[in-house]
Amino acid sequence: MSQHPALARATAFCEKYTLRVPILMAPMASACPASLAIAVANAGGLGGCGALLMQPDAIHKWVSDVRAGTNGGFQVNLWMPDPPPKRDSASEDAVRRFLGKWGSEVPAEAGDVKPPNFEAQCEAMLEAGPTIISSIMGLFPERFVARMKSKGIKWRQ
């Protein structure tokens, strides 16, 4: 008797990533405390971290904290960077006025906030060496994938 296709996919996923149960903690930015990833990994699933907003030192700390609490699998996920925005002060002023109707005034410099350096985040992930690295909204550059594979880090596409 053959397995149901869904069970076959779940079994293959578990085998590929050495899991006991097909549970994957969603790697959401700012919503993945190490303690939760540890609990998921210790229960046999895959812990996760959405590193979009994390500086390199925070990536290192998260991986170190998770390693201290589990021998189970976990992933670090990065959002592929968007192209630089084309700024338009008139449009930004209109958006700030609109948002000001619903809460505190948005300062003009709010649009100047820059995300963490993507290359530095990638380096931090390679140095920290999570079980798995994954991406969303695109693929890593080939040079990064080659280095990741040379370190034995799995890539979940």
Tell me the role of every PLM-derived stretch.
Residues S2-Q157:
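Active-site entrance/lid segments in N-terminal catalytic domains of soluble metabolic enzymes
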